[in-house]
Amino acid sequence: MLILPKTTIKALLLVIFGSLIVSFAIFFMVLENNEITVVPNLYSLAIEDAVLELQRKELIPHIEFKFSSSALDKGKVIDQGPKPGTVLRHGNKVIIFISKGAIINRVDSFIGKNIDDVIINLKANSFDNSKLLYHIVQPLEVESELPKGIIISQNPSPGSQISSLTDLQFLISKGKDHLDKHVKNYVGIYYKDAIASLLSDSINFDIDLANIGDFGNIISQSIPPGTKINESDKILITIAKPKVDNKIVFGILTYKLRQHPSYVDISVRLKGVDGKNSLIYSFKSKGGLIKLPYEVNKGSMIELYIYDKLINQTVIN
């Protein structure tokens, strides 16, 4: 039987004991390393992807937003802290900075301008520039000595930084209407003159037709002459259908205008079969349903304009 020297036995015991110590050290290091992770590179990732990547690494995302130099960065990570490659324990916080896009403009000042002029100009500019910076929120009206429709204040305020489509709301003047409106006597008047008077006085009206004599004249009105009315009141007038030959068409142009906070210029124009243009009606309106009688040649075209912008065409057959 082989008997090892004592020195050899001691050496073997030391090797075995040392191996056990190293094994335990490696075991505990592995256990400890399971609680740490390396911060990933999040640059250029979309916000959703960056958050998921941090959650996968058992790190807590903290999101902050700021402007960047490029509009293409919007919604993506443009900076992070700590930097990629940093070793952290699970549950630590990583700040990711998300781009709000580039500052592409500052809010203009519209204070002191008429609301309808501003809206028309903004829409025209958006078509020319192929981009829309503002979404106009319904304006708020307040009592003021300023003329009706004048912008008193705006939100966002002039000079505010914007990077994308921005809600823009105005506070506008209601103005003061010092003239009371009274209904006139329209019965017995030819319909064209009655309509012109109603439009000139900015009185809302509806039209009914009757197949009786007195061709083309107003035969009744729903509100008696001399009655004081409000802006919201509407009068119904009944027209005796005019007598026309087979080349002429009598009808009612009906169209629902978009509501405006103040009066806008409306015109109804006729494009005749001979190519000549003429004006049928010109008036101011805040919008809503309009009914306008016409008497034109077959084949003519009636055009409806807000200011000088064509909004409707009707071919008469």
Curated annotation (Swiss-Prot):
Regions crossing the membrane: 11-31
PROSITE patterns the record matches: PASTA
Record keywords, A-Z: Membrane, Repeat, Transmembrane, Transmembrane helix
Highest taxon in the source lineage: Bacteria
SMART domains in the record: PASTA
Gene3D superfamilies referenced in this protein's UniProt entry, alphabetically: 3.30.10.20
Pfam families in UniProt: PASTA
A cellular component term, taken from the record's GO annotations: membrane
Keyword Transmembrane: yes
InterPro entries: PASTA_dom
Membrane topology: Single-pass membrane protein
Sequence ranges assigned to domain PASTA in this UniProt record: 33-100, 101-174, 180-241
Subcellular location per the Swiss-Prot or TrEMBL entry: Membrane
Protein name: Uncharacterized protein BB_0063
